[in-house]
Amino acid sequence: TKYYGNGVYCNSKKCWVDWGQAAGGIGQTVVXGWLGGAIPGK
């Protein structure tokens, strides 16, 4: 698993967001926006 910052993690199969950490990077809403569409249940 690799951590990309702003709560974003990726492994060989998928990427996901830790929203607790993502909330600390509120200035990076563009990143969270395009990742958010690919994350079920968020």
Curated annotation (Swiss-Prot):
Cysteine disulfide partners in this protein: C10-C15
The entry's keywords: Antibiotic, Antimicrobial, Bacteriocin, Disulfide bond, Secreted
Gene Ontology CC, one term: extracellular region
InterPro entries linked: Bacteriocin_IIa, Bacteriocin_IIa_CS, Bacteriocin_IIa_dom_sf
Gene3D superfamilies attached to this UniProt entry: 1.20.5.130
Locations listed in the record: Secreted
Secreted among keywords: yes
Family annotation (PROSITE patterns): BACTERIOCIN_IIA
Family classification: Belongs to the bacteriocin class IIA/YGNGV family.
Function recorded in the entry: Has antimicrobial activity.
Protein name: Bacteriocin bavaricin-MN
Species this chain originates from: Latilactobacillus sakei (Lactobacillus sakei)
